[in-house]
Amino acid sequence: MKWLPNAESSQRPGMNNQEDLLNDETNEDLESLLRLSVSQIIRKEDSEQFLHWFRDSAMLIAPEFFKQFPNDLDARCSFLSVFGRAIWNRTPLPSNHFRTRSLPKPERNAPCTCGSGRKFKQCCASVETLGSPFENLSLLSFVLDSLSASQREALPYAYLNHEELAFVARQWMEEGREKESVKLLEGLFADIS
């Protein structure tokens, strides 16, 4: 997984307790879900279309990941809604200079985003207020993986989060992708100077 360093954690950078909770199969399922989600987001950059796709597809793509949740339809719908929004909110968008474009937090009395027909405060608000266990998850590497080499060379480095870029470069080094990592860092340093 692609976990950003947690400033409050004494663990090695890039690791969080969340990763320790996932077994290999679950981790692979979640990584596939995130990769496909980012691909879907990048393809259209349409939040409504993505959230609809996510609600319909997530459990089919990552069955091992979703086995760890109670077999309660309302709870799963709530989680899918909140998790889909979290993925959207963490995905850097090419049309926004590779910065995120977060969805507004639903109003308490507005219809719930999960489609239940209930008010948000009576439905998914309790799930959303728990905070996201994925707040330190980096989706930038999935975004960059979806780009061609020429698109990567033209990245608007001034707009990108430099800490996250450095994290992705280190991750790629660990994966044996040294040349790609160097090109990413060269672009970053060229933009800084």
Where are each of the predicted segments found?
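Acidic/negatively charged segments and metal-coordination signatures
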Residues: M1-S193
